């Protein structure tokens, strides 16, 4: 079976920045499962996987435009500190979901001032070209429920209390390994491992 739309694919991968810094990985023992062709991965990686088979190992370079896009200065904002009422101590590096007209957007605090906080809504890998080392671990047919929901369901029973067709990580689902709240495989703004 070859990687194609509507199939569930299990990937082991490492991703590095152009200068070789490892930013994320998912080993063979805990692969990333995703529904191919549903925007669950960044477009450059999903395109590169098309047609591959179980056991295929390959490297792929994904440019910023096919990953998380270019860095957008308009996504950096200075907001009043009282927006964060209920948070005891605001620190640089803290991440939050900001409610916007387009829905929740992950932001990171980049500066804390006397009465204001500077937040950045860019993905942590925006503007970066990425290098992936990938292994296709498994491929299977998706269930009707997975196709209807637009994402993979884990080994345990998966119930939904939402009415959107979200995808792994991008809308609050977890695929079983840690990305520090961001992740690197997620599709731009609408899914994948990453929140953004």
From Swiss-Prot:
Quaternary structure? Monomer. Binds to a broad range of unrelated Tat signal sequences. Interacts with the hydrogenase nickel incorporation protein HypB.
UniProt record similarity statement: Belongs to the FKBP-type PPIase family.
Q: What is this protein called?
A: FKBP-type peptidyl-prolyl cis-trans isomerase SlyD
**Where is the region PPIase first part?**
1-69
The record's listing under Pfam families reads:
FKBP_C
- Give the EC class as a word: isomerase
* Miscellaneous comment text of the record: The activity of SlyD is considerably smaller than the one found in other PPIases with the same substrate.
Reactions this protein catalyses: [protein]-peptidylproline (omega=180) = [protein]-peptidylproline (omega=0)
Give positions of region: IF-chaperone. Answer: 76-120
Indicate which residues the UniProt annotation says bind Ni(2+): 167-168, 184-185, 193, 195
Q: Gene3D superfamilies from the entry?
A: 2.40.10.330, 3.10.50.40
Summary of activators and inhibitors of this protein? PPIase activity is inhibited by binding of nickel ions to the C-terminal metal-binding region and/or the C-terminal part of the PPIase domain. Folding activity is inhibited by FK506 and by permanently unfolded proteins, irrespective of their proline content.
Could you tell me which residues belong to the region PPIase second part? Answer: 129-151
Top-rank lineage group of the source organism: Bacteria
* Comment field on protein domains: The N-terminal region consists of two globular folded domains that contain prolyl isomerase and chaperone activities.
Q: What is its EC number?
A: 5.2.1.8
PROSITE patterns per the record? FKBP_PPIASE
**Biological process GO annotation list?**
protein maturation; protein refolding; protein stabilization; response to heat
GO CC annotations on file: cytosol
Q: Which residues cross the membrane?
A: none
Instruction: Say what the protein does.
Output: Folding helper with both chaperone and peptidyl-prolyl cis-trans isomerase (PPIase) activities. Chaperone activity prevents aggregation of unfolded or partially folded proteins and promotes their correct folding. PPIases catalyze the cis-trans isomerization of Xaa-Pro bonds of peptides, which accelerates slow steps of protein folding and thus shortens the lifetime of intermediates. Both strategies lower the concentration of intermediates and increase the productivity and yield of the folding reaction.
- Give the observed phenotype of the deletion mutant: Cells undergo an apoptotic-like death upon DNA damage characterized by membrane depolarization.
**GO molecular function list:** cobalt ion binding; copper ion binding; nickel cation binding; peptidyl-prolyl cis-trans isomerase activity; unfolded protein binding; zinc ion binding
